Amino acid sequence: MTPNIHHDKILILDFGAQYTQLIARRIREIGVYCEVWPWDHSPEEILSFGAKGIILSGGPESTTSPGAPAAPQHVFDSDLPILGICYGMQTMAVHLGGATEAADKREFGHASVQVIYPDTLFSGLSDHPSEFRLDVWMSHGDHVSRVPPGFTITAATDRIPIAAMSREDKRWYGVQFHPEVTHTLQGQALLRRFVVDICGCQMLWTAANIIEDQIAHVRERVGCDEVILGLSGGVDSSVVAALLQKAIGSQLTCVFVDTGLLRWGEGDQVMAMFAEHMGVNVVRINAASRYFDALQGVYDPEAKRKIIGNLFIQIFEEEASKRKQAKWLAQGTIYPDVIESAGSKTGKAHVIKSHHNVGGLPEQMTLGMVEPLRELFKDEVRRLGVALGLPHAMVYRHPFPGPGLGVRILGEVKPEYAELLAKADAIFIDELHQADLYDKVSQAFAVFLPVKSVGVVGDARAYEWVIALRAVETVDFMTAQWAPLPYDFLSTVSNRIINELRGVSRVVYDISGKPPATIEWE
């Protein structure tokens, strides 16, 4: 019998920190289910959620400002263990009768925390055992200047006298540093101490248990009905296909729209993996000509994204309408999509780019929704894919934008540009694999620049196209640094592209970070 993997869980109340989702991922890695909710969620829902502990996240606001987000009273009335992180510790202190103040200087980066009192949270944790010190990551302007009644100061730094505090009888804890980031060396151990030892959660959130749970859920939900899935070849839809094939077999039909804007040979790879190897019923629609016709004369990146997304919906609808027995639509929605969707309702989110096929299918479609990954982060989806038997190379492939090469060809999209770019990109990726560099960068790809540069072919001058190479290193894709690939490697890639592809005279390497640049060029 499958254990109830949602029984023991943690609730994270989000005050707007950039690291909040990272807290959730770290807790999931421990093996415990958790969810992220806005800090001002309704008291009734927070209490009925059934969490075994609550974490108050960091945030960008100042507790010294009027109207700053405050820790809700009902959280402290719940008798649950509470861990406040950074702003979460500060709002806990203010709410319970302590005080905060603005620091003379922001404390950002590496810091050394001296453990003054080894309470349950800190007991046995140290990076320098003889001194009871922890190497941590700080990111704050305010700090707690007076602990609330009943609290004990448990740690300090050279800059702030209260770096952590606790009230053991209530199981309330606060840390000014960020245990969720890898720079805090004992961070994962500290979170495990809170989640497992203090809150008493069992570690049931594993790939094997998640698969069993979702198979049972899908079977119960869809019964004997047919399910239709838009298969893109990306990680999310591929894992959904593998999971549903295991759950309902021939009841699943996948629609694979070959846009002509995919990576080199990707369409054939998708068919070989799912239709031939796994026995999935896949309908392949060769729609390249429709996409290139629709994109003719279109130069604006946002317009291209919308055309590509809308045409996908149109083609998918056409195919779905042929399948009268289909009662359910499966999608690869993942947990960050759910969090961002909820966050956008606050009005604080800003659209930087239109995202392809995220909640894009029309509401008038009468199909029920099946979203077996909606509780999972991307790293969990990848682990699920491996557990389901998908090749490691497919599951851990670099991200690829929904509009595909359509946003890696600057300006107008033409078939000859797409073919040239796909081949150049394949050469770049092939060389990364051969040099054992592919897994050392977070994302790498080629970009087609619609400008011609003079070159020499034989004894003649030629004006031919320019290809840009882009490789970045990042933890969360919110910020990124360009990857310092070796010069001899870049030379090899450049020589191969220019020599093997007719029509390219120059290759350049993008050394822009994010910010100010985005990872994709469009």
Curated annotation (Swiss-Prot):
Pathway: Purine metabolism; GMP biosynthesis; GMP from XMP (L-Gln route): step 1/1. Residues 9-204 form the Glutamine amidotransferase type-1 domain. Disulfide bonds: none annotated. Pfam families: GATase, GMP_synt_C, NAD_synthase. GO terms for molecular function: ATP binding; GMP synthase activity. GO terms for cellular component: cytosol. Its EC number is 6.3.5.2. The active site is at C86, H178, E180. CDD domains: GATase1_GMP_Synthase (cd01742), GMP_synthase_C (cd01997). SUPFAM superfamilies: Adenine nucleotide alpha hydrolases-like, Class I glutamine amidotransferase-like, GMP synthetase C-terminal dimerisation domain. InterPro entries: Class_I_gatase-like, GATASE, GMP_synth_C, GMP_synth_GATase, GMP_synthase, GMPS_ATP_PPase_dom, NAD/GMP_synthase, Rossmann-like_a/b/a_fold. ATP binds at S232, G233, G234, V235, D236, S237, S238. Keywords: ATP-binding, Glutamine amidotransferase, GMP biosynthesis, Ligase, Nucleotide-binding, Purine biosynthesis. It comes from the Bacteria. Catalyzes the synthesis of GMP from XMP. Homodimer. This is GMP synthase [glutamine-hydrolyzing]. The lineage of its organism: Bacteria, Pseudomonadati, Pseudomonadota, Gammaproteobacteria, Lysobacterales.
